[in-house]
């Protein structure tokens, strides 16, 4: 069982709040006054999955939002996390569903012009996930110690689970995550899904990704990249072995640009809080698995990720 200590990143102040969507109803369909300022809802999709699958996964969600608010929804399909971060900084997006580290980066890059609205609540009532290091089941590597002298693939430099969290925790353990130190080599595979594929194709010995850590391991757990790939029949969990798990990490937030109208932000939050009950299939597809719903959050909950980014920048300056 995965430990869920309150010292986990971002969870100390948040705790385990109640399920916020149980008594929520979907906003009544109709055009809003805020549509004069937001005539198109521009939404960013983080990288890490191929474009066709990303668009198919959110198609029902996009159509429902358009029908509810009666304005077009334009999707920005970014090649990587940085694409969405930079689009927020350039005021080219209204909203995106982000990782916690990507939110922190967007907040820093935009001068504080983003606000977190809500995070996923898992089936056990928690609001966290774990970063995991995995290898091929036939690799003979069964522990983090077995990765010494082996190659490791990171997912994305702006990913919490795929880069920042493991690097931080490895340093705490006395493991230098830089290339040619503990690991023989490291590199970026181009996203979470691409990292799994690279490991399965023996381009790297191990890789990093995220999972809820809950539910049946054979199905890729209840939520996360592994679950998504199992559902798409891209992965059989019998071919993969998880050899290390991080401390629990606060789930990434649904994010909105701070400069948008308050009524728009309130409608967007209400839409998402009601989504799991009103449209469970659309919710599961959008949220990459079977979470329980959404819980409101505030910027202070993500302060640890801003601190981590600043520490990572300091490490780069010392190289």
Can you annotate each of these PLM segments?
Residues 28-104:
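Extracytoplasmic small-molecule ligand-binding "clamshell" domains
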Residues 88-89, 147, 199-200:
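Hydrophobic residues within well-ordered alpha-helices
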């Amino acid at each position: 069982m995965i430990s869920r200590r309150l010292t986990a990143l971002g969870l100390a102040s948040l705790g385990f709040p109640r399920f916020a969507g149980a008594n929520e109803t979907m906003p009544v369909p109709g055009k809003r006054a805020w549509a004069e300022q937001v005539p198109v809802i521009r939404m960013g999709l983080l990288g890490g999955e191929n474009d066709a699958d990303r668009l198919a996964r959110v198609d029902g969600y996009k159509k429902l939002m358009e029908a509810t608010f009666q304005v077009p929804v334009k999707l920005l399909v970014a090649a990587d996390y940085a694409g969405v971060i930079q689009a927020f900084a350039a005021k080219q997006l209204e909203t995106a569903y982000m990782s916690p580290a990507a939110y922190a980066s967007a907040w820093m890059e935009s001068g504080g012009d983003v606000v977190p609205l809500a995070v996923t609540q898992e089936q056990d009532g928690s609001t966290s996930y774990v970063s995991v290091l995995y290898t091929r089941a036939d690799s003979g590597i069964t522990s983090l110690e077995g990765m010494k002298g082996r190659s490791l693939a990171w997912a994305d430099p702006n990913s919490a689970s795929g880069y920042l969290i493991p690097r931080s925790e490895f340093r705490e353990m006395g493991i230098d995550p830089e290339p040619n130190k503990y690991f023989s080599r490291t590199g970026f595979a181009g996203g979470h899904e691409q990292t799994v594929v690279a490991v399965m194709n023996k381009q790297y010995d191990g890789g990093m990704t995220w999972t809820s850590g809950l539910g049946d391991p054979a199905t890729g757990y209840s939520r996360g990249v592994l679950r998504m790939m199992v559902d798409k029949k891209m992965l059989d969990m019998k071919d993969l072995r998880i050899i290390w798990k991080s401390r629990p990490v606060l789930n990434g937030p649904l994010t909105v640009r701070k400069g948008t109208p308050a009524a728009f932000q309130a409608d967007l939050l209400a839409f998402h809080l009601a989504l799991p009950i009103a449209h469970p299939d659309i919710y599961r597809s959008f949220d990459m698995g079977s979470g329980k719903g959404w819980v409101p959050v505030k910027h202070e909950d993500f302060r640890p990720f801003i601190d981590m980014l600043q520490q990572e920048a300091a490490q780069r300056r010392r190289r």
